[in-house]
């Protein structure tokens, strides 16, 4: 009996307490030029998949939005109103961008995260939801997709390019900069609070994100044309072959907005708001009981 138990101990000596076989030790991988950056083949493959997802999602989002914007701005009956201020025109543009980003995020969130916006990617990077490397990897396809979508929309629709960003209603460059900053901050903060924060409703994050972009267009279109996305502004400018001297506000404003949104989100993390919210909920349930 003792011999059998000794044989059994020898046979299972390579198993850990959970029953996992630790007898096989994989050979050490040879060092490569990417080793010091902790980048292996799988990571590069994942970055490539994310880049493809961001390109497809951004292209689909902006192509639909550009074409809708062209239709809204092409109605001759609306020319008596200042550009972007007619209620019907404004609502059509806002709904076009809001719904376009909503279904694009739902389609590609599982592939690349569905940022579709360099400013949103920056806010996700600041919140450590994605790595700096992934942020940079996402920027390039987003910007290229914006230009591709602008070119495709321009080629497929007759007439002038009518989806560019421009200051209007007497808005100055400084006002336009702050409008773009705060409009982008609203969008980025919505992303951080609905997609990054762990909640039961995370799977529905595309809905409030689309609504926030809709509201940003309702508020900003008459004044700045609503950029809140450098890829969107650049793509339209390239398609129209026209860069106003204040085009920089459509880059600096959204990037500052990403920092502003992250600052608010980070303040809430420092205050550990979830602990107090959960405590209040628990106290309320006790009172009801």
From Swiss-Prot:
Region: Disordered, residue numbers: 1-36
Keywords on record: Cell membrane, Endoplasmic reticulum, Membrane, Repeat, Transmembrane, Transmembrane helix, Transport
Motif (NPA 1): 117-119
Principal localisation: endoplasmic reticulum
Transmembrane segments: 48-68, 91-111, 136-156, 176-196, 203-223, 248-268
Keyword Flavoprotein: no
Membrane topology per record: Multi-pass membrane protein
Residues in the Extracellular compartment per record: 69-90, 157-175, 224-247
Listed GO CC annotations: endoplasmic reticulum membrane; plasma membrane
Pfam family membership, one: MIP
Induction, as annotated: During exponential phase in rich medium and repressed in minimum medium, hyper-osmolar medium or in sporulating conditions.
Protein localization: Endoplasmic reticulum membrane; Cell membrane
GO MF terms, alphabetically ordered: water channel activity
Residue intervals on the Cytoplasmic side: 1-47, 112-135, 197-202, 269-289
Function statement: Water channel required to facilitate the transport of water across membranes. Involved in freeze tolerance, osmotolerance and cell flocculation in liquid cultures. Is non-functional in most laboratory strains.
Domain notes: Aquaporins contain two tandem repeats each containing three membrane-spanning domains and a pore-forming loop with the signature motif Asn-Pro-Ala (NPA).
Membership in a protein family: Belongs to the MIP/aquaporin (TC 1.A.8) family.
The name this protein goes by in its record: Aquaporin-2
Gene field: AQY2
